[in-house]
A protein has these predicted regions:
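Conserved catalytic neighborhood of penicillin-recognizing serine enzymes
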Residues: 1-21, 29
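Mid-domain, small-residue-enriched loop/turn segments at the edges of structured enzyme/sensor domains
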Residues: 20-80
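Short alpha-helical scaffolding segments that buttress acidic/His motifs in well-ordered protein cores
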Residues: 6-11, 22, 35-36, 72, ...
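Structured C-terminal helix/loop/strand segments within mature extracytoplasmic catalytic/sensor domains
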Residues: 25, 70-101, 106, 112, ...
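Active-site-proximal beta-strand/loop segments in catalytic clefts of secreted hydrolases
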Residues: 11-14, 22-26, 47-51, 116-118, ...
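Active-site phosphate/pyrophosphate-handling residues
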Residues: 17, 66, 129
Length: 179
């Protein structure tokens, strides 16, 4: 498979096998960590391949909502990628199927979203997205929810609620454009 095909499988279907193959071609987990360090992200790190990276192990394979939004801003809205590559990346995120019950679910008709949902095996669900409200600059949002006593459906409900709050803030003009 080509890099483009692997990337599309990862973005649209969260294909872990494609993620492993693409990560191997890019220098493995340490290559990904080196890449985000080059973006100025001192928090995000990759230590293991899927599916082991989804098993909680302290500081291994981690990021934060602020760190992922900062890196995503540079990749999706900055000059890290060529315009055509940025457009393909965002189109793949827009086509993402696994995020349908998270932030995407909360957005009004006419808002464009490209997202990347994730979760670990037992207790954490997350989603980050580029959101394009009508007549506004694009915005980035990231939600991480960790609750060992809640199943995936319950965690997704919390992420949807966070998405609803985000929409209200945007509609009220309380979210500043920082692009």
């Amino acid at each position: 498979m080509s890099v483009g095909d692997l990337t599309q499988a990862i973005l649209e279907y969260s294909d872990n096998t494609a993620a492993i193959l693409l990560m191997r071609s890019a220098g493995g987990p340490s290559g990904l960590t080196k890449f985000v360090r080059g973006l100025g992200d001192a928090v995000t790190r990759s230590d293991r391949y899927e599916p082991k990276s989804n098993q909680y192990r302290g500081a291994l394979d981690t990021t934060s909502p602020r760190a992922i939004v900062g890196s995503a801003h540079k990749i999706l809205l900055g000059a890290v990628l060529k315009p055509a590559s940025r457009a393909r990346l965002e189109a793949g995120m827009v086509a993402c199927k696994p995020g349908a019950r998270r932030i995407r679910f909360s957005l009004p008709e006419g808002w464009l979203i490209g997202d990347r949902p994730g979760e670990n095996i037992t207790e954490e669900s997350n989603d980050y997205a580029i959101v394009r409200p009508p007549s506004r600059a694009p915005l980035l949002i990231s939600t991480y929810y960790d609750a060992s006593n809640t199943n995936t459906a319950g965690r997704e409900a919390v992420i949807r609620e966070a998405g609803s709050v985000f929409v209200k803030w945007v509609q009220l003009g309380e979210v500043a454009d920082r692009s």
